[in-house]
Amino acid sequence: MKQVMFYCRSGFEKECAGEIQDKATQLEVFGFPRLKSNTGYVLFECYQEGDADKLIQQIKFNELIFARQMFAVATELSDLPTEDRISPILNALSSVEGVPHCGDIRIETPDTNEAKELLKFCRKFTVPLRQALRGKQMLTARDTDRIPVMHVCFIEPGHCYVGYSYTNNNSKFFMGIPRLKFPSDSPSRSTLKLEEAFHVFIPRDEWDTRLASGMWAVDLGACPGGWTYQLVKRSMFVHAIDNGMMAQSLMDTGQVKHHMVDGFKFEPQRKNVTWIVCDMIEKPARVAHLMGEWLIKGWAKEALFNLKLPMKGRYDEVLQDIENLKEFLNKNGFKYKLQAKHLYHDREEITVHIQAITNISPH
């Protein structure tokens, strides 16, 4: 196997390809990306047989910013007959060496309006294909996340890529996208960005301790309160920093203190803040440096913030801003865990999470 499929946001194929090329080169896996604008995916072509499996094991998925999912491609099928799409898939898989026994199957599409029209078909196709694969002992009799998951990605009717990913190094979400419902009482749709970030960056079994009731948080650029809403919903107390007006529904909870000051000038009087979150429309380098200052001063233990991207040179901007931030933290002797992701609910921005290492459980 020599191909790896990466899903990404439509319009960000170039950034995804650049990132994958860099990661592959670091691992001494040589090849090149194939991409078309606005298709929502990138195919990386390895020169050496077997390197696809090496890539999906050795690239750390949680360190990828622009890729939503990745899987090694076992076979590509086009012009599948409408009367029997299953047999060609079974025959193709049985002729490929090295395809592991899988514990689940996801029949997906790239995240574009055109491809998503196939999702209804994908849902209908899942049960019969799953049964056929189980009949051939290619899938376990019952779903399990202990072994690889099989992916079938339809990029157009009758044209799909079939492969697999490792459950300890992939996105656990269908199509790499958490399915979240907009809460009708939230003052802004931006609330979904912070909710998705919690799902992506914070393990679910740590929510009770790291997103705990009674914690204090600071929300820079808070108005009208989309991000504050997520914190209040988790029974936190929030310093909302913005010169604009906050939603009255949030103020009525008694959990929010509104400070009408510049987000770059606010300093918490008491150093009891766990979370600093920030979705200000500012130059990304300036926001990144501000978040670094909050952490090294001990004003917060975890930071979650957006970096707005320029129209051109987006990948280079991301690399530079994150490298500068790491250098600043390292120079000040700050130990941390950093992760960045272009989330589904992000647009021309990425979301960065930093956790002070003193706040990380050793278990």
UniProtKB/Swiss-Prot annotation:
Chief localization: cytoplasm
Active site (UniProt): 308
Enzyme class of the recorded protein, top EC level: transferase
Subcellular location: Cytoplasm
Superkingdom of the source species: Bacteria
Keyword match Cell membrane: no
InterPro entries per UniProt: RlmM_FDX, RlmM_THUMP-like, RNA_MeTrfase_FtsJ_dom, rRNA_MeTrfase_M, SAM-dependent_MTases_sf
Documented EC number(s): 2.1.1.186
Keywords assigned by UniProt, alphabetized: Cytoplasm, Methyltransferase, rRNA processing, S-adenosyl-L-methionine, Transferase
Catalytic activity: cytidine(2498) in 23S rRNA + S-adenosyl-L-methionine = 2'-O-methylcytidine(2498) in 23S rRNA + S-adenosyl-L-homocysteine + H(+)
Residues annotated as binding S-adenosyl-L-methionine: 190, 223-226, 242, 262, 279
GO molecular function, one term: S-adenosylmethionine-dependent methyltransferase activity
GO CC terms: cytoplasm
SUPFAM superfamilies tied to this protein: S-adenosyl-L-methionine-dependent methyltransferases
GO biological process: methylation; rRNA processing
Subunit-level organization: Monomer.
NCBIfam families registered for this protein in UniProt: PRK11760.1 (NF008734)
Described purpose of this protein according to its UniProt entry: Catalyzes the 2'-O-methylation at nucleotide C2498 in 23S rRNA.
UniProt similarity note: Belongs to the class I-like SAM-binding methyltransferase superfamily. RNA methyltransferase RlmE family. RlmM subfamily.
Protein name listed in UniProt: Ribosomal RNA large subunit methyltransferase M
Species: Aliivibrio salmonicida (strain LFI1238) (Vibrio salmonicida (strain LFI1238))
Encoding gene, per UniProt annotation: rlmM
